[in-house]
Amino acid sequence: MLLAIPSKGRLLDPTLKLLEAIGMRLLASDERALVVPTSWRDVNVIRARPEDIPYIVESGKVWAGVTGHDYVVESGASVVEALELGFGRGRLVVAVPKSSGIKTVDELPPGTRVATKFVNIAYNYFAELGKRVRVVRVTGSVEILPQLGIADAILDVMATGTTLEVHGLVPIATVLETSARLIVHPSYVNHELTKKLTTFIQGYYAAQGKKMIFLNVPASRLEKVLAVLPAMEAPSVTPLAKGDVYEVFSVVPEDELPDIVIRLKEAGAKDIVVTPIEKLIS
């Protein structure tokens, strides 16, 4: 089965980090290789431009892929957004030169030239507003075009706004919010491999900011110790061979850990061990 991932751009590194975190290691380091085997024996990775991935998944030749919500909308491809992946967040905005004095889209004059690689989104957005603009298709960086006199405005993804500011541009409207998504061909939504992948990704994110804590507790102190633990469900309690001592373990928020450990010691807990959680699957 083939999984499409970005070959370049802002989504590449976070995607590789996520795959590594769920145990799907790429088994070839040559970045020129377009099809790469992985440590998941039933999955090979195919590298592609993020804007092409919705079309590739829609074809059915590739079961799933990682790309931006903006690219999914732009493509109009018939794919299912199975998961929001928590990275690559930004806003698709209309921006104009600060010197123009324009504050809103309503102030754009008829015939305004809007440079963008999101041509379909641009046409639909301005058509819904009843604005007559000229869309200038661009495949690379668009921020410089107003300075060159090639465009009067741009429609592009803004993460922090720094790039716009450097080029003397200000956003005047948000077209849509975007982030990285796991997309799946409709016929594979309920496939076992899709369930496996989504389960491991969700488990990885669920484990973020949490630690596993183990401790021994005398029977006489058990009730006080359990009252300290903010378990997701309930702490697990196991009697040890000695009979008057229990082993207790639980999941706790990492930012609350220092305070919890002190309170556990005061309540009578001993032999406290804290470990990281790789994945938390419920």
Curated annotation (Swiss-Prot):
NCBIfam families reported in the protein's UniProt record: hisG, HisG_C-term
Domain of life of the native organism: Archaea
Record bears the keyword Iron: no
Family membership noted in the UniProt record: Belongs to the ATP phosphoribosyltransferase family. Long subfamily.
Biological process terms in GO annotation: L-histidine biosynthetic process
Pathways involved: Amino-acid biosynthesis; L-histidine biosynthesis; L-histidine from 5-phospho-alpha-D-ribose 1-diphosphate: step 1/9
Protein name (database record): ATP phosphoribosyltransferase
Main enzyme class: transferase
HAMAP family: HisG_Long
A Pfam family of this chain: HisG_C
Keywords: Amino-acid biosynthesis, ATP-binding, Cytoplasm, Glycosyltransferase, Histidine biosynthesis, Magnesium, Metal-binding, Nucleotide-binding, Transferase
Species of the source: Pyrobaculum calidifontis (strain DSM 21063 / JCM 11548 / VA1)
Activity regulation (UniProt): Feedback inhibited by histidine.
PANTHER family from the UniProt entry: ATP PHOSPHORIBOSYLTRANSFERASE, ATP PHOSPHORIBOSYLTRANSFERASE ATP-PRTASE
Catalytic reactions on record: 1-(5-phospho-beta-D-ribosyl)-ATP + diphosphate = 5-phospho-alpha-D-ribose 1-diphosphate + ATP
A single GO molecular function term of this UniProt record: magnesium ion binding
